[in-house]
């Protein structure tokens, strides 16, 4: 079987990265839209600082090899992020 590619678009309000569009499912098998990126996640600090993050991440009990990239406005402030990953 081929690996499933997952993708997420996050909005950022200065405190939370919230999943606004995603193919990622929760542990219960429901869409993860509306859930937040864990502030303890390694990607959170990088994204909040305007930096990308690539590595192994865990979401809803599943491990992924993935990359996150910040989205910024014209003023350079972080407004969101993108995630693309493959479940391990």
Model feature map: region roles:
Residues 2-6:
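Helix-loop-beta substructure at the N-terminus of cytosolic sensory domains
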Residues 1, 20-57, 72, 85:
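Extracytoplasmic/periplasmic sensor domains and loops in membrane signaling proteins
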Residues 8-14:
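Short hydrophobic alpha-helical segments used for membrane anchoring or interfacial signaling
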Residues 80-84:
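Sensory beta-strand/linker motifs that couple input domains to effectors
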Residues 58, 66-76, 87:
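A short, hydrophobic, proline-anchored segment that marks a local hinge/packing element in signaling
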Residues 63:
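Beta-strand residues that line the small-molecule/cofactor-binding core
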């Amino acid at each position: 079987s081929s690996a499933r590619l997952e993708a997420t678009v996050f909005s950022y309000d200065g405190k939370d990265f919230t999943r606004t569009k995603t193919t990622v499912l929760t542990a219960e098998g429901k869409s993860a839209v509306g859930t937040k990126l864990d502030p303890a996640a390694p990607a959170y600090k990088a994204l909040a600082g305007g930096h990308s993050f690539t590595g192994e991440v865990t979401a809803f009990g599943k491990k992924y090899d993935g990359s996150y990239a910040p989205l910024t406005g014209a003023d350079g402030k972080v407004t969101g992020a993108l995630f693309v990953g493959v479940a391990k």
